[in-house]
Amino acid sequence: MNQPLTVTLTQKAPLTSLLLGMVTLIALIVLPFLALLPADHPLAISTYTLTLIGKILCYAVVAIALDLVWGYAGLLSLGHGLFFALGGYAMGMYLMRQAAGDGLPAFMSFLSWSELPWFWSGSQYFVWALCLIVLVPGLLAFLFGYFAFRSKIKGVYFSIMTQALTYAGMLLFFRNETGFGGNNGFTGFTMMLGFPVSATSTRIALFLATLVLLIASLALGLALARTKFGRVLTAVRDAENRLMFCGYDPKGFKLFVWTLSAVLCALAGALYVPQVGIINPSEMSPTNSIEAAIWVALGGRGTLIGPVLGAGIVNGAKSWFTMAMPEYWQFFLGLIFILVTLFLPKGAIAQGERPMSRFQLTEQLIYAEINAQEPGAIQHAADQYRQQRDPVLTLENINVSFDGFHALRNLSLQIGVGELRCIIGPNGAGKTTLMDVITGKTRPQTGKMVYDQHHDLSTMNTIEIAHAGIGRKFQKPTVFEALSVFENLELAQKNHKTVWASLCGKLNSEQRDQIDETLAILRLSDLRQRQAGLLSHGQKQFLEIGMLLVQDPHLLLLDEPAAGMTDAETAYTAELFNQLAGKHSLMVVEHDMGFIETIADHVTVLHQGQVLAEGSLAEVQENDQVIEVYLGR
């Protein structure tokens, strides 16, 4: 999803969205004050009901936090219950000190402890408790995320590690000697900031504080989604490799949102504890973290408001089931998960977005016949560059093997400045491996690689190589399908690609002009706001080429750029490459010999990881070794 549902609704129906939001907010603000009414008043609510709704609001904050990492960054955490519980324990320490006064907490006296553990120091102060609420879960999340993302752990392995982390925390807190109350945890709270915890006025204040946290969390999520940072997270989820080849380091973005998410959970846990009156290790149970994932899945990932509703629906149903039919709750929860997976894979809220009809979709994907349009104006100096012939890329004796299979054997190759080099060869010749080596995806065992006369590619990673000026297009067009055409080009542009820049930076007029010019060159101007996933195959090919062009690279590596294109699209692609050659150096891997004939400047034939022949297309076509390889004689 390109934008969260709340943003989409605001754009499509601003008045309706505003009214709905205001009515809901007013209702939640008024709700706790109904607890002050006499018990026999028809509008009065009980303290139990107020506590239940406050607890659900805390869970809603957790759902938003999980949606930020799972719905946007694609990181399924099964351990957010740990951060929630740590925030609760930090608040519980403060409440236990308030209840004990100058003495030891009750559980410590029961265990015959004579003094407070060192880590309880200062816990009687509310400000220090707030610091613990934020710093302890935040630091743990940062350290865990740093090593996990640095090790490139992702997918199911990341989920398993988060589940193991929360399970380890639960086992640790179950032990009496750790100083956290063991199996019973913390309870018996009496005072908070000088007010009785059980007083109705205190519960109203806690409810309103929870509501403020929920609104702030939702507003923060919306703000992030509107920034370039939110679009980068979406790109991490949908095509992390493409993002790296655009020059971004995903680790920093994932670490930032992961730590932020943990802190939000901790704040929710801190407000949860004084409302329910207890915190124990069961809050760290992996089951609770899995339930949180169900809230997000039910409401709709990447929608922000959906997980809030999902948390409300599931926990409202849980409260009813655990009283009416407690033995069936787990079965009901499993049924919800199965139904959502089978019938609502995008979540219940996402169903509110009506899919386009086949006619509408077809109509939107059709664009003017390419041959009927004038070629895009591309400024270049082909003759000037082609006369230089200084090598932009030099490979010497490159060897790559995988488990004894030699993908590249003593391969040597030079690409000149402004040259358009075509690489051909049968399947398995090493063409894609060659591109992997040049872009840092695969490290050669031996050999020398020099780019632009002074860059040693063998010591650089993919991100550094992208910043140095090498752009790569993959065999299968790889774009950020949840983002618009314009946003794909925006992310790929050559500029600062740090977390801070993505949070604060905005496009200037020069950058917008570059995107507009690129869209015109690619014949995609009319589709600038189209979601990239709705483009035709050929249009995706053009978009990916455009993502390379806005990076302003010196060397473009293009892997089967004409594959799957129509004849008209193929013809225009050939024209485009001929115009680009000179301003850029191009290395094109392609099987379509008709396409090769229209662009061939110099052709290299690979076979079994070695250079078999080089020269003009006519020369390699007459080469006996090439004929033998292609025709088998």
PLM feature spans:
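ABC ATPase NBD Q-loop/coupling interface
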Residues: K448-H467, G505-L507
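Helix-to-loop junction immediately C-terminal to a conserved catalytic motif
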Residues: T439
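A short, surface-exposed alpha-helical micro-motif characterized by mixed small hydrophobic
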Residues: I596-T598
